[in-house]
Amino acid sequence: MPEIDARLREDVHQLGELLGDTIREQYGPRFLDKIELIRKGAKAARRGSAEGAQQLTATLDGLEEDELLPVARAFNQFLNLANIAEQYHRIRRRRPNEPEPFENLVLEELLGRLKDAGHAPGQLARQLAGLEIELVLTAHPTEVARRTLIQKYDAITAQLAAKDHADLLPEERSRIQQRLQRLVAEAWHTDEIRKVRPTPVDEAKWGFAVIEHSLWQALPNVLRHVDEVLLRSTGERLPLTAAPLRFASWMGGDRDGNPNVTASVTREVLLLARWMAADLYLRDIDRLAAELSMQQASPQLLARVGDSAEPYRALLKQLRERLRVTRNWTHQALAGEVPAAEGVLEHNRDLVEPLQLCHESLHACGMGVIADGALLDCLRRAATFGLFLVRLDVRQDSARHAAALSEITEYLELGSYDEWDEKTRLEFLLEELNSRRPLLPAHYQPSADTAEVLATCRAIAAAPPASLGSYVISMAGQPSDVLAVQLLLKESGVDWPMRVVPLFETLDDLDNAGPCMERLLTLPGYRSRLSGVQEVMIGYSDSAKDAGTLTAAWAQYRAQEKLVEICRQHEVELLLFHGRGGTVGRGGGPAHAAILSQPPGSVAGRFRVTEQGEMIRFKFGLPDIAEQNLNLYLAAVLEATLMPPPAPEPAWRAQMDRLAKDALLAYRRVVRDDPQFVEYFRLATPEQELGRLPLGSRPAKRREGGVESLRAIPWIFAWTQTRLMLPAWLGWETALLNAIERGEGALLGQMREQWPFFTTRIDMLEMVLAKADADIARLYDERLVPLELRPLGRRLRDLLSQAVRVVLGLTGQSLLLAHASETRESISVRNSYLDPLHLLQAELLARSRRCRGDACGGLEQALLVTVAGVAAGLRNTG
């Protein structure tokens, strides 16, 4: 079996040694010996040694109160260092005989297959250049690591890269070692837990930092790669202003359930993005001005700058001045309302046009090699990021819009909008949308909640349209939900067709998505308010929490099929926006496989998807990693567009209907119908404590109540911490077993081999089952759950074992992930460091629940460190 690469093992070992040296220096050799005893005990216990398990428990039980935090920190920090080594290993320098990573070759290989399938080279070039892929960065934040630490981790990565050269002199190698030791010590002596929750503005700045430090470099590199691959494969170039990849954001725009995101926050974030963009372009222009010292220029460029000895510098100086004016104005506007100064860049063409003029002139004068260097990179950035860096979406719950309209209709003595049926609502909304008079009198004084809804709409009206993405309506279910937002926007002065996007996110709403959109598209005047495409968002997190992942996945698939069919009938272009989380329980999983498993016709050159929380750092935190993931997106969307998977066979559909029905009953039997379930969940997991974790700006709950009141993220996060991973698999075990007992095993095997949708779901299920651990979950029960609730825990662990058996039978393996031994070994290696954290966490939960008063601070800090450590070890949180 292929083991983990020796170079990766060496990096992990070295970082572990450096961490040990740092801990020894602070706490002495005896303390380090204890940590080593714990690690060895965990490793032996994993191999089935009763003596090892005993030693592990005894050492942990013998820890003094003041040792709990440093022990938790040691294992947490090691797992973070292992993540750094693993992430670097994906992009490390290749040896001469090593194959290139799949991600670097995927596009060229795909273009070859597409040509073999009969696609003309010119068509392929046009299709690739015309792709519209938008990655929407969201905070949601399960990002446990602090930004301060992330910067130190990136610096460690840089030193691992510096070390990866065979020709280093002994002195150079020693210097790198010293720098690594210093950085590991800095990370160790930095508090890994935030003391206060980040504000929505902090979250937005974190998103901008990912662009500044990674995507700003990765994007032009990816497009340069696309250009080279296109030239080799088709003989054509990628057009200068092609922008197949774009970025949007919810940070500072997503107010659903987050009272901290106000209209003034949205305005501030829009201005900060504009400031950041101007600042980044200024750095580019300074570099270009230093490079472009040439004298020879085209007549068109000379006509712009007059008689200048250095015409390129003269033109760039003009652009630099306007960028400075723009940056200075946004800085002033952040302090208060300031009218835009003369010279502020308002339109992207004002940024692109001078750069394009320089590029064309250099080519015309025989200096194409210079034109296609840093100048081309800057042009690519200008076409992609524009003047506003990211397009900001706004999201709000449909109930907030309905409440605002109820208040307005009652004030106008028209009755209560809330109490009207759908027909009455639509009649009112259509009449008001077509009316030329304002709905609200000038002296109207709304309540605070309604004032905030209207202020958000006015903030949209005041912002440049190009700085905004879509207005997403969460918990949408009826056509009136969309028209309500259109009316509120119109009333607030939005005179351009902003995309208003219904988000269907419960099982019932997904089932109703097709009929809802059918009705909407036939309403008088609706089509004229569309901005070219009809965008619809599919919710993965809440539908999975509502119905379980199997039933939700099939409902999402069917909803997309129906939406494709309806939009085709109405000759409207459809853009599906996928609200995926980072974890399987929230629709996560490898993006490449997920895109290729979408229903045929649902991608069609367009793809919009959320990139959430900690996954942003893992997928886009380093430029080289970001390049690999952006390559995968381009290839997958192109393939799903030109070589979509076949429609499922009728027998497969019927089977999915049966599976979904059985899974829904099994899932809800536990989560909704068992009267002990909510109490068990709250006691067996750190769910209550997670609410106190200063992760994001958004509260963990929507309102008081049971599981349905929880947000999808803490729901997943809590089960991940105990390794039961319940939301990701519950329902599958019963549905698959029932199918096998009905004699449908061969049909399931056929679906797994021939239908990408089903294959991807089974692969993701297998991965999550490999990370689940019934023994760890049992430890939490033994420490935290009263005797009368423990039978429920045993039943859930039995269901987990059943899920594992069924998946092994379906895949024909004796071990989970037998086909991916490196991944399996990676999980196994991490378990030696995760197990002590789980044991500590269970103990700390027990102590903190008994604790009262000031003495609890130290316990809570240690507990939060174990939470962060488990999240780091499993590479995901919520």
UniProtKB/Swiss-Prot annotation:
Keyword Transmembrane: no
Active site: H140, K545
PROSITE patterns with a match to the protein in the record: PEPCASE_1, PEPCASE_2
Pfam families: PEPcase
Molecular functions per Gene Ontology: magnesium ion binding; phosphoenolpyruvate carboxylase activity
Reaction(s) catalysed (UniProt annotation): oxaloacetate + phosphate = phosphoenolpyruvate + hydrogencarbonate
GO cellular component labels: cytosol
Cofactor: Mg(2+)
Protein keywords: Carbon dioxide fixation, Lyase, Magnesium
Statement: the UniProt record of this protein carries the keyword Cytoplasm: no
GO biological process, one term: carbon fixation
E.C. number: 4.1.1.31
Domain of life: Bacteria
Protein task: Forms oxaloacetate, a four-carbon dicarboxylic acid source for the tricarboxylic acid cycle.
HAMAP family: PEPcase_type1
Family per record: Belongs to the PEPCase type 1 family.
Protein name from the UniProt record: Phosphoenolpyruvate carboxylase
Source species: Pseudomonas aeruginosa (strain ATCC 15692 / DSM 22644 / CIP 104116 / JCM 14847 / LMG 12228 / 1C / PRS 101 / PAO1)
